[in-house]
Design a protein with these regions (language model features):
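Peripheral, non-transmembrane regulatory/ligand-interaction domains of membrane transport proteins
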Residues: 1-215
Length: 216
């Protein structure tokens, strides 16, 4: 799915690409892959890295293109493992800014709605990255509460039964916590690397930066 947004006191959906708009692509088709690689000409290695479900948060620059990968939480269709985390890539150069995810997420669509409701401006590409990191921390917390509820239920069931299935259910749910903690740690390291980019230091919104640091 491909969507374009322009910044106007919040992110407003538009029909086609314009310079400096935000292009969001989720679960890219072959047509969208060709659009990214041939029309927008992002590095193919960046595309492949984002596609790797185990890719860690990081920042990389190649031929003027910047790739930033963060991890965000998503719901799973697996009843035993209800939540996990996925990589989201932000790729930008000049007038082009793209987010790419190979999984459908609640977070990105909610982020668009939130910016419109609160009239939030996106100043530049790094401002978008920081706001997405902040949004991800909110979703981690939201899902963490649900994980804790499921753990409590599994513990209660385990107290009532000594069946191996109940223990396995608890262990599986606790895996969600491991996924969350590993991804949050990776996002925190990513944030500190972004902070150390000399060319961007004077452009950062210090209040936003502090908010992200606190939430992560």
């Amino acid at each position: 799915m491909r969507a374009f947004y322009k910044n106007n006191n919040g992110l407003i959906a538009i029909e086609d690409w314009i310079p400096n708009c935000w292009t969001n692509i989720e679960c890219p088709t072959e047509t969208e892959k060709r659009y990214l690689l041939e029309e927008l000409q992002i590095p193919e290695a960046f595309y492949s890295d984002i596609e790797d479900i185990d890719e860690r948060p990081r920042i990389e620059i190649e031929n003027g293109w910047t790739l930033i990968i963060m991890r965000i939480p998503v719901k799973s269709n697996d009843v035993k493992l209800p939540f996990h985390t996925i990589p989201v890539g932000i790729v930008f150069k000049g007038e082009v800014c793209i987010t790419i995810s190979f999984h459908k997420t609640e977070m990105l669509s909610d982020f668009v709605t939130y910016t419109k409701r609160k009239n939030i401006d996106i100043k530049d590409n790094f401002d978008l990255v920081l706001k997405l990191l902040l949004s991800s921390s909110v979703w981690f917390l939201k899902y963490l509460k649900q994980v804790n509820q499921k753990i409590k239920l599994a513990e209660d069931n385990l107290e009532k039964s000594i069946k191996n299935e109940e223990l396995q259910a608890l262990l599986q749910i606790e895996k969600c916590l491991v996924f969350f903690m590993t991804s949050l740690k990776g996002n925190d390291i990513l944030l500190h690397r972004i902070k150390n980019i000399k060319s961007q230091r004077e452009h950062f919104d210090l209040d936003l930066l502090e908010d992200v640091e606190i939430e992560l």
